[in-house]
């Protein structure tokens, strides 16, 4: 549904009422007649190549085939021969032919004017039946198999309308064999049209049974009842015997609550999931061609609509059958209702309707409505979302381990093409060149000043990266472009989860936001470091990859220790103990300086002075017991644990804490602290939203300052990726060295 009354048009896919379908499909002619219902299964007359009256190509319903011409080949205001004017009284001043009833208008109306088929019996929409779990089964509270048997007339629902008097005293669902004996008794009383009245009151099947149950639903009462039941089940979660049943029931209630809440918010009635009027697409969207010698080439929709119309007409004729025993009439009507349901299923979604109908001439199944709009070649992705647009590019993605989470590597050749208008404006504005022609010549020569100005432009202009298919909002994100000399786009590996991308040849598209509103939206809402959590369940969508985790493991690994490390060595009087066994540092800077000067390795253990906070230290072991107590002559004491020591004064106050750690763990802890510090500063002192100024550079600078604190989030993962690469290089060097030693060819 496209709402064109408002300022901004929008496309909304939702359930609609039968009244709305009638409003879309019916047309009021100038003489006051209402048209729109398709009753004839035929399409065109092969003898005259003209549409059949009241058929799926009728000119009265969908408009004329030729502009300003009716079905009689008569133009508005002219005689059939084109010489004399026809009397206005015969053709109507409003432009309606009295002979064929076709309006004189533009033939393009056949592209958007719809029709409808009035179904003789309600038909359930297949999208809400064959889905697991079924929406209808969730609302009604029955199993999926029972709902399917009701829809396809294998079961009967007793007393569908409880507010009317009934003859039979059945309850619930009944099979065909259970009601056969009662049918024989009611033979003299019920037949023909009386069966319809009997069906509405006593036994219902097919779409009628589903519609009756959905009409009686009160969504708000159902929502409250489901919520109260869910609250009661929360109190019984400790019962082990029924734990699995309780969990299943809780999950079912949660789905029912969500679905009922969505229906209430969208103002949708549940009975709209059962179709009474079937919309017919405009003829131009399902064309038909006659190629001579009665060879017809037509859209699959026409065959499917024809089958629906034929079976609907058969069901209408079945209601008019008079006489005969009740059970034979009932069986015949039940069969016709099932055939109509299957025909509508094949039209809407042949993939879910079981065995799809095939075109025996071309030996392939017919394309249903779902097949046309779904998938990569469907209407949305191929025609609406798959269009080529200006200011866009495309290239292969490769990993960028040196990038921040909000950055992407943009090839220089792509950037200079995308930002060429901005380059020309800046070159002229800064006085480098005098006109556009000189600026283009300068850009073609690729002189250094061009790259310098391009760097300045990229600093305040994000780009959008998109990978098809765009299934959710993480499929297109904004990044700060960084110029690279390669021809591939560099991407941080942590954001690949949202794109569902990997580095095995995947391609991504680059789009350039042009307007000030689009750039603002990219900065505030679409940057990758501001989209870290999944909106569906709150779990992180941006997570460290396996390479990063392995690098962090290598970074924080401690060198294996044994007693030989602390053994006295009398043969070396200058170094009786290993130098790294008793190394002690007081702050981070001392550790980093010693590591840079190669005085200590990454994995060797050392003692590090820790901050005294409440005299405690968190460990992985609760209430850890000291290994040893040491008391000094001045009254101070020292408690020695497995991985740390605590020195206390005579009063019991904690003086110092030393922990046993490594340089790698200190580096990792420092990165984590910086990341948390950036988040805490951002939350404690939130900046106000920048005022919309005329100078966009000032506004973008304020937005950059407000977003810069979050850019430290990816540093720990980046550090892990760095050490993973370093370790992989060392392993590769060792393996190559061993290979050279064993292979005479490489030697």
Curated annotation (Swiss-Prot):
EC number: 2.7.7.6
Cofactor: Mg(2+); Zn(2+)
GO molecular function, one term: DNA-directed RNA polymerase activity
Binding site residues for Zn(2+): 70, 72, 97, 100
Alphabetic keyword roster: Chloroplast, DNA-directed RNA polymerase, Magnesium, Metal-binding, Nucleotidyltransferase, Plastid, Transcription, Transferase, Zinc
Cofactor remark from the record: Binds 1 Mg(2+) ion per subunit. Binds 1 Zn(2+) ion per subunit.
The protein's enzyme class: transferase
Subcellular location, record wording: Plastid, Chloroplast
GO BP: any one term: DNA-templated transcription
InterPro entries: DNA-dir_RpoC_beta_prime (IPR045867), RNA_pol_asu (IPR000722), RNA_pol_N (IPR006592), RNA_pol_Rpb1_1 (IPR007080), RNA_pol_Rpb1_3 (IPR007066), RNA_pol_Rpb1_3_sf (IPR042102), RNA_pol_Rpb1_clamp_domain (IPR044893), RNApol_RpoC1 (IPR034678)
GO CC aspect terms: chloroplast; DNA-directed RNA polymerase complex; mitochondrion
Keyword Zinc: yes
Residues annotated to bind Mg(2+): 502, 504, 506
Catalytic activity: RNA(n) + a ribonucleoside 5'-triphosphate = RNA(n+1) + diphosphate
Recorded superkingdom: Eukaryota
Principal location: plastid
Family: Belongs to the RNA polymerase beta' chain family. RpoC1 subfamily.
Quaternary state and interactors: In plastids the minimal PEP RNA polymerase catalytic core is composed of four subunits: alpha, beta, beta', and beta''. When a (nuclear-encoded) sigma factor is associated with the core the holoenzyme is formed, which can initiate transcription.
Function in brief: DNA-dependent RNA polymerase catalyzes the transcription of DNA into RNA using the four ribonucleoside triphosphates as substrates.
Protein name per Swiss-Prot or TrEMBL: DNA-directed RNA polymerase subunit beta'
């Amino acid at each position: 549904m496209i709402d064109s009354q408002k300022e901004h048009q929008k496309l909304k896919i939702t359930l609609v009422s039968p009244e709305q379908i009638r409003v879309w499909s019916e047309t009021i002619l100038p003489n006051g007649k209402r048209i729109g219902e398709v009753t004839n299964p035929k399409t065109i007359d092969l003898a005259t190549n003209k549409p059949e009256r009241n058929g799926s190509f009728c000119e009265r319903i969908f408009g004329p085939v030729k502009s300003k011409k009716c079905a009689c080949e008569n133009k508005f205001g002219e005689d059939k021969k084109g010489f004399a004017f026809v009397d206005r009284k015969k053709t109507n001043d409003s432009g309606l032919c009295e002979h064929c009833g076709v309006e004189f208008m533009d033939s393009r109306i056949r592209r958007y004017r719809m029709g409808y088929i009035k179904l003789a019996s309600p038909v359930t929409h297949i999208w809400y039946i064959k889905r697991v779990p079924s929406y209808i089964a969730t609302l009604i509270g029955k199993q999926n198999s029972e709902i399917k048997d009701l829809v396809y007339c294998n079961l009967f629902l007793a007393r569908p309308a409880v507010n009317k008097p009934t003859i039979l005293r059945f309850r619930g669902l009944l099979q065909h064999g259970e009601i056969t004996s009662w049918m024989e008794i009611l033979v003299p009383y019920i037949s023909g049209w009386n069966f319809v009245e009997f069906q509405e009151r006593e036994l219902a099947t097919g779409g009628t049974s589903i519609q009756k149950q959905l009409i009686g639903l009160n969504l708000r009462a159902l929502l409250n009842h489901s919520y109260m039941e869910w609250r009661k089940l929360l109190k019984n979660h400790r019962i082990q015997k029924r734990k699995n049943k309780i969990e299943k029931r809780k999950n079912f209630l949660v789905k029912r609550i969500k679905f009922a809440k969505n229906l209430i918010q969208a103002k949708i009635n549940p009975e709209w999931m059962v179709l009474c009027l079937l919309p017919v697409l405009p003829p131009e969207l399902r064309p038909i061609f006659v190629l001579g010698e009665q060879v017809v080439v037509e859209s699959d929709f026409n065959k499917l609509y024809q089958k629906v119309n034929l079976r609907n007409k058969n069901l209408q004729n079945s209601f008019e059958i008079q006489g005969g025993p009740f059970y034979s009439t009932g069986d015949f009507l039940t069969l016709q209702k099932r055939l109509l349901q299957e025909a509508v299923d094949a039209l809407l979604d042949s993939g879910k309707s079981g065995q799809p109908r095939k075109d025996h001439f071309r030996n392939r199944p017919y394309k249903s409505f779902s097949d046309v709009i779904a998938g990569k070649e469907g209407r949305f992705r191929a025609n609406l979302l798959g269009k080529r647009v200006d200011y866009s590019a495309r290239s292969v993605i490769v990993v960028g381990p040196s990038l921040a989470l909000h950055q992407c590597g943009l090839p220089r050749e792509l950037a200079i093409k995308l930002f060429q208008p901005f380059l020309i404006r800046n070159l002229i504005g800064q006085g480098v060149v005098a006109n556009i022609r000189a600026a283009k010549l300068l850009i073609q020569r690729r002189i250094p000043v061009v790259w310098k100005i391009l760097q300045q432009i990229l600093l305040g202009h994000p780009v959008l990266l998109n990978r098809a298919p765009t299934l959710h909002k993480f499929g297109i994100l904004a990044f700060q472009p960084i110029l690279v000399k390669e021809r591939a786009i560099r991407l941080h590996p942590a954001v690949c989860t949202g794109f569902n991308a990997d580095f095995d040849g995947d391609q991504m598209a680059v789009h350039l936001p042009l307007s000030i509103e689009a750039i603002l939206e990219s900065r505030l809402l679409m940057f990758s470091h501001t989209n870290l959590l999944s909106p569906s369940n709150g779990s992180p969508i941006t997570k460290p990859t396996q390479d990063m985790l392995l690098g962090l493991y290598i970074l924080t690994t401690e060198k294996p220790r044994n007693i030989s490390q602390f053994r006295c060595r009398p043969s070396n009087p200058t170094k009786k103990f290993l130098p790294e066994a008793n190394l002690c540092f007081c702050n981070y800077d001392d550790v980093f300086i010693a590591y840079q000067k190669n005085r200590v390795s990454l994995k060797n253990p050392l003692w590090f002075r820790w901050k005294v906070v409440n005299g405690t230290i968190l460990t992985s072991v609760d209430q850890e017991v000291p290994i040893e107590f040491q008391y000094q002559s001045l009254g101070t004491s020292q408690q020695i644990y497995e991985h740390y020591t605590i020195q206390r004064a005579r009063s019991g106050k904690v003086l110092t804490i030393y922990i046993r750690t490594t340089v790698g763990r200190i580096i990792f802890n420092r990165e984590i602290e910086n990341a948390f510090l950036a988040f805490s500063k951002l939350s404690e002192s939130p900046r106000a939203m920048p005022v919309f100024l005329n100078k966009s550079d000032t506004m973008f600078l304020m937005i950059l300052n407000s977003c810069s604190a979050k850019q430290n989030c990816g540093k720990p993962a980046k550090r892990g990726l760095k050490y993973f690469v370093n370790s992989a290089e060392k392993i590769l060097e060792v393996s190559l060295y061993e290979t050279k030693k064993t292979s005479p060819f490489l030697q």
